[in-house]
Structure formats: structure tokens, C-alpha cells
Amino acid sequence: MVDGLMKLNGKRIVFKGVNRHEFSSITGRVPNRDEVIKDIVTMKKNNINAIRTSHYPDDSMLYKLCDIYGIYMIAENNLESHGTWEAYNKGYVDLDFVVPKDKPQWREMMLDRANSCYQRDKNHPAILIWSCGNESFGGKTIYEMSQLFRQLDKHRLVHYEGVFSDRSYNDTSDMESQMYTPAAGIEKFLAEHPEKPFICCEYTHAMGNSCGAMHKYTELTDREPRYQGGFIWDYIDQSIYKKDRYGKWFLTYGGDFGDRPTDGDFSGNGICYGGEREASPKMQEVKFNYQNISVDFDSDYIFTVTNKNLFVKKELAFKNSLFKCCSKPS
């Protein structure tokens, strides 16, 4: 963190990221090496530069591949108590129901979990940020987790989105992190609260025919230096293969096994399909908005090339063809 901005080797970084669950349509929560490599290669082809390991440490294989291919990481600790604070926010329960909050009986277990997360993965250069977990409200216990990460690692930043719901320990997170805040809302927040840089740890919820208006966020990274990007929710549909009555394989979601209750197809939020892990049409929007090189024309037919890569040389070679010659409009 330099002058209120997250920087990598002295340059302001913009996260063009995705949230990624560990998932295979064949083996469930244990994707194989070929599947993970396909994910990484697909990301590189489509200008994705970062992964948030939502919401737990992934197989070590992923971290090694991110080191090799050059994908930045938010390494997330295994923590989520979504239901308890959501019930509190809806008025169903008292604040005492929320965990871990300030409850001392959670402290030792959570510090151990954070320490395990750090010790296993500390030597991976792909990791730029440690995350205390996901959507677990706020409180002293999670703040102490963040302090443990800082004590163990003087060079990486610490992330936690939950302070958005509970500002009692606002310094838990080194950056302001929110979910699904409109681009205009981010700009307004930064105008009123300029103390920290801002990321969307989840945005552009990719369920169904989605990812429209993504450009409002990526354009904001150019206009507002303290907005430093975000992580799409999420990378791949979590769907499982099953045979129909004719013996043909198809991809299933909640309820297709007679399971009740179920969230239905709410696990299908990816910019890649399940199964063969192919990019969906939504990926075209992602690739365009995450592009690092853009060309703009003005009214005098002069074009400007912008290179947003942090460390790639700015010398570029061009080849152009004139398809039609016309007079300049008056």
C-alpha cells in the first residue's frame, strides 16, 4: 500500500478478477489437474488476471499453476457464517446469535485456521492478499485474525468484506471491499470515504443472460484511481453430470436428484459452463471489458492506443488495411 493505493512493484494494480469455486461436473469438489489448467488458460485468453479462492483454501495445485502462469490471488481463509448475521439483519434473532462476532470461544479455533492458511501457502508469489473469510459479519475475533496475518506477513495486504456490515473493527481490512455495489455507488462512497482503496470482491453476478453494464465498472477503474477492480461472481457453473432415463448424460442442478429443500439452479452462476468447462457467451463481454490494450478514434480520424499492462513493453507493431476511402464529413 503506497499513498493509499495498492501497488505491485511500484505500479497501481487493477484486479480483473473472478471468484472461483473448486468444482468439477464429474468429481464434484475435486477437479483434476487438466481441469484446473484449462481454467487458468481460459482466464489468460480472456484477460482475467486474478482469482479469489472463494471461500476456502483451494488445492495447492491451483496456487502452483497461478505462480507459473502469472495469475494474482486473494487467498481466502475458510470461514462463512452467512446465515447467522442474515437472520439478525432480518430481525429474526438477537445480535448474540451472530458468530463469531466477539465470542471468545471462537478465537483459538479461528486463529488456528488463519495460521494454517498462511503456513501452507506463504511461499506462493501469486498471492498478493490474504482474506479472513467471507460474509461473517464483523467483530473482535475476525479483527484478531487479520492482525495475525499482518504479524506473520509484513508484505501482503489483508482483506475482509464483512466490515461493510459491522464497522466496529473497520481496520480489519486494508481496503474497502463490497459486493454488488453499483458503479455510481462506488464513486459516491469514495468521494465521501477516501481513506482506503476500494475493490468489489463480488460483482457482475453471472447467472443467466448477464454481465451487461460491466463496462461501467471497468471504466471507473480508469476514472477513479482508488477503485482498483473487482472479482466476478463467479467462474464456472456448479453442475453435476447425471444420466437421463435413456442413458444420456446431462448437467443437473439443485432438485434434479429429488433433493429438498434446494436453491435450484442458483449454483449456475458461471461465465464458463460446467461439464467441459467451455466459456459461455458471457465471456465475450468479460474479455472485452478486461482488455489491456484499447484503440480509440477521434473526429479527425486519429487513433490512440492505450496499453494498460503493468509490465509489458509499450512498443507495439501495427498492420492496417484501407477497406474504403471516403471524404471527411463536413
Question: Where do the language-model regions lie?
Answer:
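Extended substrate-binding grooves/exosites of carbohydrate-active enzymes
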Residues: 1-304, 308-316, 321-329
